[in-house]
Each structure stands twice: as structure tokens, then as C-alpha cells.
């Protein structure tokens, strides 16, 4: 303190050498925008049939800027092999992402006497490109900096179908069954922000996977004298 006033290491000159003084890049902030949209439809046709459906779409966009001191330029610029690849400089980098998620959920229900049926499905699609740019490099003009230093994208499709039944066989005895099929497709490509070596450059991404799942479930329940309930089920989950 000095005259009752406190100072931080960032603005105090009380014996700190220049190399210990710290400053921060003012624009290093996390920024993210998300917009959610939904359309919901619910309709009962009669005492037996009902329908529910929901369509949705979500948009997202985010970025942050970061100051890097004495960064290796080979991790950001396409430099020729040799001594020039070891050049370093101060720079400001920006990482950006944009995502889209859309889909539909729908189901129908049917009830008659002692039987309840439900069936439906859903589908969704998700994509989310990521990329990075350089806003500024010390000692270089803007046109010398080039384009994106990493760039990748991902696509995901997710769909499922289901059917469900509940049947009151007798007083206190109910049987139920539930069947679900799910399909997932996932692709990713491009390069991420991890530098591997001078020969490889940024780490490559190459994923192409498809998955199929079938999840059956069945069982019964029995209520005795309105006080005791016995329950048995069998299921397979994937």
C-alpha cells in the first residue's frame, strides 16, 4: 500500500521489474449466441386417437479471441520447410464455431377398453463447423496472414422408431411391451487446432461411423388387494 491505497501487480511500480508486469488482451472474451425455435402440435381426433408432434431448430454461434506471445508461426501459417519454419511472433488468434440442430418428434396414441397403444419416432440432424483465423501477426500485413489455420466439421443424424403396448388381461394383471429401434450416423472431417509436426501439420480428423440399436422390453405387473404389487420385466439395452 501507499498512503492507504492498494495497488495490484499490474499497475504498481513498487520494486517489480518490467518482466514481472502483466497485462491482458482486452478482447479475450467468450461470446456465444443461441436461438431456439419450436413448433408444437397436439390434437385429439376422438376418444381413441391422439397425435402429438414437435418440430425444433436451434442455431448457435460462438467465438473468442486470444493473444499469444511469441507463438510458433509454423502452427498457424503454411511456411516453407527449413529455418523459416522456426519463426515466432506475437499474434491474435480467433476460434469460431457455428452449429445447427433441427428435427422432429412425433407420436400417436390409441386407447380402447383394456388396451393402450403408442407408437412414433423422431429424427434430428446436427452440424457444427469449427475454424480458426488470425486477426493480427506482429510484423506482417493482413494480406500476408492467409486464411483459416484449422477447419473442421461434423454431421450427426439420429433417428428412432418405437411401439408400446399396455394390456389389462384381467383384474390386477397387466402385460406390457416396448420396442425401440435407433440409428445414429456420425461423420467428422478436416483438421483440428492441435499441431502435430512439420510433416503432418495440424491434426487430421476423419470419422465415418454408423450404429444400429434395438432395445426390446416386456413384462407384467400384478396388483393384489390394492396393497401389494408384483412386477417382472425383461429388457435389452444398447
How would you describe each model-predicted region?
Residues 1-35, 62-67, 93-98:
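Flexible loop and strand-edge segments within Gram-negative outer membrane beta-barrel domains
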Residues 31-196, 221-225, 229-233:
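Face-selective signature of the C-terminal outer-membrane beta-barrel domain
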Residues 190, 200-209:
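Outer-membrane beta-barrel domain signature, especially the mid-to-C-terminal portions
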Residues 237-238:
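Acidic glycine-/aspartate-rich tracts in secreted/extracellular proteins
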Amino acid at each position: 500500500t501507499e498512503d492507504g491505497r492498494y495497488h495490484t501487480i499490474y499497475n504498481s511500480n513498487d520494486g517489480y521489474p518490467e518482466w514481472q508486469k502483466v497485462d491482458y488482451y482486452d478482447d479475450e472474451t467468450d461470446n456465444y449466441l443461441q436461438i431456439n425455435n419450436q413448433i408444437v402440435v397436439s390434437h385429439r381426433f376422438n376418444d381413441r386417437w391422439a397425435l402429438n408432434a414437435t418440430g425444433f431448430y436451434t442455431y448457435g454461434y460462438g467465438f473468442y479471441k486470444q493473444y499469444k506471445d511469441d507463438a510458433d508461426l509454423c502452427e498457424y501459417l503454411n511456411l516453407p520447410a527449413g529455418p523459416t519454419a522456426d519463426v515466432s511472433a506475437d499474434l491474435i488468434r480467433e476460434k469460431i464455431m457455428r452449429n445447427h440442430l433441427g428435427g422432429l418428434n412425433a407420436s400417436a396414441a390409441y386407447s380402447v377398453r383394456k388396451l393402450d397403444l403408442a407408437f412414433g419416432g423422431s429424427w434430428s440432424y446436427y452440424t457444427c463447423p469449427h475454424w480458426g483465423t488470425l486477426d493480427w501477426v506482429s510484423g506482417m500485413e493482413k494480406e500476408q496472414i492467409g486464411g483459416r489455420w484449422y477447419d473442421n466439421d461434423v454431421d450427426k443424424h439420429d433417428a428412432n422408431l418405437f411401439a408400446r403396448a399396455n394390456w389389462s388381461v384381467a383384474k390386477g394383471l397387466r402385460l406390457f411391451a416396448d420396442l425401440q429401434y435407433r440409428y445414429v450416423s456420425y461423420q467428422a472431417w478436416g483438421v483440428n487446432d492441435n499441431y502435430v509436426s512439420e510433416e503432418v501439420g495440424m491434426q487430421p480428423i476423419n470419422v465415418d461411423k454408423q450404429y444400429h440399436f434395438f432395445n426390446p422390453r416386456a413384462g407384467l405387473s400384478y396388483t393384489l388387494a390394492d396393497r401389494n404389487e408384483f412386477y417382472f420385466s425383461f429388457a435389452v439395452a444398447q
